[in-house]
Amino acid sequence: MTSAEIREAFLRYFETQGHTRVASSSLVPANDPTLLFTNAGMNQFKDCFLGLEKRDYVRATTSQKCVRAGGKHNDLDNVGYTARHHTFFEMLGNFSFGDYFKRDALKFAWEFLTSEQWLALPKDKLYVTVYHTDDEAYDIWNKEIGLAPERIIRIGDNKGEKYASDNFWAMGDTGPCGPCSEIFFDHGEHIWGGLPGSPEEDGDRFIEIWNNVFMQFNRTADGVLHPLPAPSVDTGMGLERISAVLQHVNSNYDIDLFQHLLKAAANIIGIEDEGQPSLRVVADHARSCCFLIADGVNPSNEGRGYVLRRIIRRAVRHGNKLGATGTFFYKMLQPLIEVMGQAYPELEARREVIEATLIREEEQFAKTLEQGLKLLEGELAQLKDKTIPGATVFKLYDTYGFPTDLTADIARERGFIIDEAGFEVEMAAQRQRARDAGKFAVDYNNIVKVEGETQFDGYTNTTGQGQIVAIYKDGVQVDEVSEGDEALIVLNQTPFYAESGGQIGDTGIFKNETGIFEVQDTKKSGGAFVHQGIVTVGNLKTSQNVEAIVKADIREATARNHSATHLLHAALRQILGSHVQQKGSLVASDILRFDFANDQPVSFEQLQQVERLVNAEIIANTAVTTELLDIETAKAKGAMMLFGEKYGDEVRVLSMGSVIDEKNFSIELCGGIHVKRTGDIGLFKITSEGGVAAGVRRIEAVTGTKALEVVQKADHDIQHINSLLKAQKDQTVERVQANVELVSALQKQIEQLNQKLANFQAADLIDQVQTIAGRQTLITTVQGVDAKALRNLHDSVKSKLENAVIVLAGVEGDKVSLLASVASQYTANLKAGDIIKHLATELGGKGGGKPDLAQGGAPLNEKFGQVMAALPAWLEQK
C-alpha cells in the first residue's frame, strides 16, 4: 500500500465505525496561545476534551498535519540523521468525546491493524504496553482481544515522579489526564533493540506505531486524580511509521512518499547518491516549509516565522553542501504536490506564494552569508589569540543565520578554532528564550472554566438582559464582587462582542439594583464570553440578572472600520493581485490595521487606486448581507477564507459591495460586527503603508469622522505651507520644489566651503605631528566640528600623511566625536579600533571599527583633557 492509500484506509475504516471525517486543522493553532505549532491530532479538539466546546459529533477521525521544530517538541537537529525524526509528519487519529472508551478504542485499533480487510499485520509481530495500574486495559488486551501475557508489558512511573510515565498522559500539571496503551511492531531480530521497558528499548527493532490515550481523570492541584464523568479517547498513529511497516522498510525515508522527494531533490541538485543525510534534510524540510507557508506563516525573526526561517536556511545549507547552486529549494514544491497535493489541495492553491517566499528567503540567505563572512573576517583580524569567542559564533548564527559548522570550517582554514563551550552557553540561553516564546501568552482557559456557551445576541442589539453564571477575581472563582474589585464576569447571554478576527471586544456596563460593573474588554474562553472590568458601584453576585449595555458609539465606529477592512482586502486583491492574503488585522474604534502578503511596498499611485475603489463602494451605498452556509457552499460561492482560522461546519458569510458577474465586490467568512450599508462607513482614508516582516505589508486607515479629520488636517497643513511660501494654492508644489532645489544647492556650497576649511586646517595640523613608538603620529582636538566635518578633516590630513597614525577629537556642544586611522604597515601591532575603544571607554562612550579606521563618540566631561593628554603614553606601549 502507498502512503496515500494507508491514509485513506484509516479514515475510511473509522467512518465505518461511526466517526466523522474532520479535515486537518492549520499548522497555526487556532485560539490556543500556548502552542507554537500544531503538533498532535488532538490540538484542534482541545476545547472538546476540556468540555468548553460541543460539536455535532462525538466521534471523529483525522489525518493531521503536524510540525515539531520549536519549543518543547523540537526534532530539528536530529532530522536527516535518524530513521524516524521529522520536522513535518502526519498523525492519523480517532477521537471519542465522552462516547466510547477503552474497550472500543483498543478493539478498533486491533481490528484495523490485523484484519485481512484492512492492514493485515501479523499478530505475532505486535506487542502492547499499558500503565502498570491499568488492569482494565490489560484485561481487554488479554481476555477480550486474546493477546498473550508475554506480549502485554506494564510500564510504571519511569520519569522520576508519580504519574510521570511513558504510559501516562497529561495535558498539564492539572486538568485532564490518564493512562495510555501503546502498540509496537517488531521489525525483526536482524535489527538491534529491546522491548519497551528494557535497557535496549531505544533500539530500532520494536517501534511504537499507535498510542491510545484514555482521558480518564481530572488531576487537581494537590495531585489527586478524580474520575471524569465522561471519559474520552485520543489516539495517534504516525503515517510515516505505519507506512514503513507496511512497505517492509526500516526507515521512514525509504517509504514511497520520501523516495519520491529524495529522487526529486537529487535530480534538482544534480547528484546520484540518494542516501546522504543532507538530501534527507532537504526532502524533510521541503514538507514543513511548504505546508507552513501554505498555512500562512511567513519567515521572520521571531516566533513561528523565526522557526520557519531556520528550517529554510538549514535546508539551503545542506543543499549547498551537496553542490546546489543558485535558488533550488523552491523547486521541491512540485514533487511535493505530486505526492501530497490530492490530500492537501492548499499546496496547489498557494503555489505562487510558497514559491515566491522560498525564492526570496534563499536570495536573502545568500546575502546573509556574504554579510556574515565580512563580519567573521573582521573579527578574525582583531583577535589576539586563535580562539573565536562563543559570543561571536552565536551572533553569527543567531543574528545572521550563519551556520556554526561553516564558521568552524572557515576558522580551521585560517588556523583558528571556535569556543564551543562559550557557544553552548549562548545557545542554552537562546533555547530558554525559545521555550519562553513557545508559551506565547497566558492561557485564558486556565482561569475560566464554564460549562455551556454564552448566547451572543449583539449582531442587531447593543443592549440586552443576561444572568451572571460565573465571576472570577484574582484568578479564582467567587460568588460575589464589590465596589473597587477587578473581575471577570460570564453571562448566559450578552450583546457584548468578544474579541475575535482582529476586532476588539466591546466595552460598556452591566447594571442592576445592587451594583454597576464597567466592562473594559470582552474576550472568549471556549464558548464563554468573558467580560473583564471593575465594579464601580455596589456589588454583583452569581445568578443575578443584569442589564448589559454596550457603548453604542464605540461599537458603531468599530463596525465602520471592520466593514472597511473587508473592502480594503478586496480592493488590494484587485489592484495588486490574487496573491494578497490577510496576515493579521486590528479593528478598533479609532483605526483599522491590515497586514497582508506582498513582496513589494505598495506605491503611492496604487494606494490611491485602492482608496478610490473603496470609496466608490462606500458611495454606492449597497446593502451588507450575512447568511449562514455550510462550509462547502461558502467555498463554492467564492468566500475568502483566512489561512490558520478555525471554521465550523456552518459559517457566517458576509457579502458587500457592487455585484459583477453575480459576485459581490467582497465575500468573506466573518463573525464580526458590521455596518448595514456600505454608505454607513462615510469615508475611507489610508494613513500609512509599510513593512512589518519579510513579504508582509501593513496598511493603517481611518473611516468616518476620523477620515474627515485627516483630510481636513492635510488641507490645513497645505494652507499653512502656502502662507509660509507666500504662494497661491495651485503654486504649492512648484514653490516647494524651487525651495528644495535652492537648499540642495546651498548645501553643496557649504560642503565645498567645509572641504576648503578642512584643507586649511589640515595644513596647520601637520606641524603637530610627533613620533611615538617609531610611528608618525598626529593627536589633536578640533573645536566646533561634528562627526561629518571630522571625517572631512581626517581625509584632508590623510592625503598629506599617508603613513601615519591619526587620532582626531571633534568637540561640539556637550559631545565629542572620535576618529582614528592607522597606516597598514602598523596594524599588526596597533589597531584603530583599539584606539577608539580605549578612548571611548575612558570617556564613558562607545566606538570601534576596523584595524585601519574606526569611529566613536562620548559625552564631553572633565576627564576629556586628561584622557587626550595621556594618549601618547598609551600609544608608546603598543
Curated annotation (Swiss-Prot):
Gene Ontology biological-process entries: alanyl-tRNA aminoacylation; negative regulation of DNA-templated transcription
UniProt keyword annotation of Zinc present: yes
Compartment(s) of residence: Cytoplasm
Keywords, comma-separated and alphabetical: Aminoacyl-tRNA synthetase, ATP-binding, Cytoplasm, Ligase, Metal-binding, Nucleotide-binding, Protein biosynthesis, RNA-binding, tRNA-binding, Zinc
Catalytic activity as recorded in UniProt: tRNA(Ala) + L-alanine + ATP = L-alanyl-tRNA(Ala) + AMP + diphosphate
Chain residues that bind Zn(2+): H562, H566, C670, H674
Molecular function per GO: alanine-tRNA ligase activity; aminoacyl-tRNA deacylase activity; ATP binding; tRNA binding; zinc ion binding
Required co-factors: Zn(2+)
EC id: 6.1.1.7
An annotated GO cellular component: cytosol
Residue ranges that the Swiss-Prot or TrEMBL entry lists as coiled coil: none
Protein family per UniProt: Belongs to the class-II aminoacyl-tRNA synthetase family.
Domain-related comment: Consists of three domains; the N-terminal catalytic domain, the editing domain and the C-terminal C-Ala domain. The editing domain removes incorrectly charged amino acids, while the C-Ala domain, along with tRNA(Ala), serves as a bridge to cooperatively bring together the editing and aminoacylation centers thus stimulating deacylation of misacylated tRNAs.
Function: Catalyzes the attachment of alanine to tRNA(Ala) in a two-step reaction: alanine is first activated by ATP to form Ala-AMP and then transferred to the acceptor end of tRNA(Ala). Also edits incorrectly charged Ser-tRNA(Ala) and Gly-tRNA(Ala) via its editing domain.
Protein name: Alanine--tRNA ligase
Provenance organism: Acinetobacter baumannii (strain ATCC 17978 / DSM 105126 / CIP 53.77 / LMG 1025 / NCDC KC755 / 5377)
